[in-house]
Design a protein with these regions (language model features):
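N-terminal phosphate-binding caps/lids of nucleotide- and nucleic-acid-binding domains
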Residues: 2-278
Length: 278
């Protein structure tokens, strides 16, 4: 008998869509931290346990979410960044599609505690693997705390493709390093399995971030770059000839504050240094 074409149930559709956003724990951390950045936070604390599978906690001092908007924030395509299609041409935020929270809460237990500066109290709200709870008032500081637990517990097929906890934690550590480097004006405090990994000051000095994430020897072996021509600004740091590696793990490129992998730019940088490091 032929299989009939049918419309997927919302539950199945949400789990499939979640895989596009919440591919692995590092994807979840990325979405939550970018939300914190978009909220205007200048202090972000990220804590993970068991490679982010057991726990991901992201706390920020951003503007928070008004209590009446919290349940809406977990709906698909719910965003404060867009109103019309024309707005797509003027996006300056890290995210805008309104898919992250709905996708994450479909495959995890998600807890939010948030408060705006204008509110007398905050709000506490839980979505447990797609099942919404009730919003309650809570005493808390301004900003938002997002807690994600038991990631992919209801999607065994997705869990099967994850690597061991230490490897997943490594992916998150790489991500946090790039985020800290891309936003030196934000203080990042990163904790893994109860142990502090690094904490940046948020003073805007990229060299200070490098010192915290790569160490003193690395920080002493870089020099600043600041160049502007034809409306294009290039800034950052490059390593001195004695600071060379056999791969691109320490080569990090950002365009308008976003991390990218671009073989053309990478190749140009390598060619420029070829004679210096040989």
């Amino acid at each position: 008998m032929e299989e009939k074409i049918h419309v997927l149930s919302p539950d199945v559709a949400d789990k499939i869509a979640a895989g596009e956003v919440a591919e692995r724990p590092s994807s979840v951390v990325k979405e939550l931290v970018e939300n914190a950045v978009d909220a205007g936070a200048d202090k972000i604390i990220v804590e993970i346990k068991n490679g982010g599978i057991k726990l991901i906690r992201v706390a920020d001092n951003g503007k928070g979410i008004p209590s009446e908007q919290v349940p809406t924030a977990f709906l698909r395509h719910a965003t404060s960044k867009l109103n019309t299609a024309d707005d797509l041409y003027n996006i300056s935020t890290m995210g805008f599609r309104g898919e992250a929270l709905s996708s994450i809460c479909a495959v995890a237990k998600v807890e939010i505690i948030t408060k705006t500066a204008e509110a007398e109290a905050g709000v506490h709200y839980i979505v447990d693997h797609g099942i919404c709870g009730e919003a309650d008032e809570i005493a808390c500081a301004d900003g938002t705390i997002m807690i994600v637990e038991d990631l992919f517990a209801n999607v065994p097929a997705r869990m099967k493709f994850l690597k061991k906890d230490s490897t997943e934690a490594g992916y998150i550590s790489d991500l946090m390093t790039r985020l800290a480097l891309s936003k030196p004006n934000i203080s990042f405090d990163y904790i893994c399995d109860g142990k502090p990994v690094f904490k940046t000051s948020g003073d805007g000095d990229l060299t200070n971030v490098i010192l915290k994430v790569y160490g003193l020897k690395f920080a002493k072996a870089v020099m600043p770059v600041d160049y502007f021509e034809d409306g294009v600004k290039i800034s950052g740091v490059i390593g001195k000839p004695e600071l060379s590696f056999g791969n691109r793990t320490k080569q990090t490129i950002f365009v308008n504050g976003r991390y990218i992998k671009n073989h053309v730019i990478a190749k140009v940088a390598e060619e420029a240094f070829r004679n210096a490091v040989m």
